[in-house]
Amino acid sequence: MADSINYQLAKFVASYGKVSQIPESTCPEVSFVGRSNVGKSSIMNKLFGRKNLVKVSSTPGKTSNINFFEADDVHFVDLPGYGFARRSKAERDRWADLIGDFFDSERSFNLVVSLVDIRHDPSKLDHDMIDYLQGNEFNFIVCLTKADKLSRTQQARQAAAIKKQLNVPAENVIITSSQTGTGIDELKRRIAEACL
């Protein structure tokens, strides 16, 4: 395998409603997780250099299954967004169970990309996710999304505050924007480091 991933080869593989349906890992995997409407699908599309490979919706909570994509023998896993209030409690519980079951399963967790909106302080669910990843010693990074909505000064201030609140080392935090492409090369570098 080369020292970089050819993202132009990205394709949709499958969608799963239950973890038990997912085949065993056969290649490196990068999992993307974050609150509903954090910009997960947009960041993945920017990574792949595609507009609509990962379905983007203006309706939060649209992704309700675990979706697998593949590029150059690396799997990219789009997990359902957590914490969307306008879904029923049963649906929110199903998603929480689905995400929990996924991370409890025996898989190739080469890298977990936890996405947090840079404009807001991390929610309790964001804290819970980071605590879980840290407590279980996952290799993870935090992607701060929607950086284009803030000035550079505001970005730096918010990034510093979020790092402190989440207790995450500076080198594990990347400021990103799906609009401008900020941070995408760094994200690709971290993925290659973890998977190749």
Predicted region positions:
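Conserved C-terminal guanine-recognition region of P-loop GTPase G domains, centered on the G4
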Residues: G100-E171
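Conserved alpha-helical scaffold flanking the Walker A/P-loop in AAA+ ATPase domains
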Residues: S64-F68, D97-S105
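Canonical P-loop GTPase G-domain recognition
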Residues: Y7-V19, K149-L196
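Helical mechanochemical/support elements of P-loop NTPase systems and associated helical scaffolds
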Residues: T26, N52, N65, E91-W95, ...
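Flexible beta-alpha connector loops of hexameric P-loop NTPases
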Residues: Y82-R92, R119, D148-S151
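Conserved amphipathic alpha-helical interaction elements at protein-protein interfaces in regulatory
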Residues: G49-L53, S105, G135, E193
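Conserved G1/Walker A P-loop phosphate-binding module
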Residues: M1-R86, L196
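Hydrophobic packing within well-folded, soluble alpha/beta domains
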Residues: I43, V112-V113, L187
